[in-house]
Amino acid sequence: MGDAVLEWFDSHCHLQDEFDRPDDVPVEPHADRLAGAIARASEAGVSRLVCVGTGSASSAEAVALARGLRQPGGPAAAEGVAMWATIGLHPHNAVDGVDGLDALLTAELDLAVEPANRVVVGIGECGLDYHYDHSPRPVQREIFALQIELARRHDLALVVHTREAWDDTVDLLAANGVPDRTIIHCFTGGPDEARRCLDLGASLSFSGVVTFKNAEDVRQAAALCPLDRLLVETDSPFLTPVPHRGTPNEPSRVPLVGAAIAHARGMDTADVAAASTANARRAFGC
């Protein structure tokens, strides 16, 4: 069985974001790019994806995109791809505060009375980023804690971003109560960090980083992660996996992530596809 016929779930992408292109490459209209990305995802076996918000405007765009693409006649519906969204404030944007997110979340949850109409399936991405420090660290910690509480209050998945902040991330999750469905997005730690997150009850989501030559520690983490706690993602349009580095990423590339994980674990890619899809569906309730 070839990888192209396997079913995959891209648990984290940003299809609302503009795709970077070299200056000499014509930029397609955004709607055309989206339709093309959805069609290629379907061809690659990607049947489900979650579009992730990083701020109030980004989250509103993710929700609108997911809702629009799921309408009859929309590209996702036409290609047999189901899409959901998350609402969240990336640590880079922590200084903006969560008021806009709370209002958007309340409106969306009120709108989706029936589960079949639900678009919002998680809070995030949120967390701590001590590499860039675009927002002061105390503000990052405060806003992360508030979003942990939002996920717990509304029984939604929590999508966590952490970079060079493992100690504070783990401490804040432990102190505020880890939501039942917590996902460490784009996991880039090694075995020690993986065990700390797993001990909290979190799941680990691996991106194209797992294909990078210098990411042996990430592959080791993927190898030790329990199969029922493992998800795959693209983080599109970022972190394009080998051999497509240097081009915009998209959901159709998630099978490359799954294949790299399967190789690291010494198992069949089909088993990684089946498990990661089931895990993502359980985590997001879809």
Feature locations, PLM:
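Mid-domain alpha/beta scaffold segments of enzyme catalytic cores
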Residues: 1-286
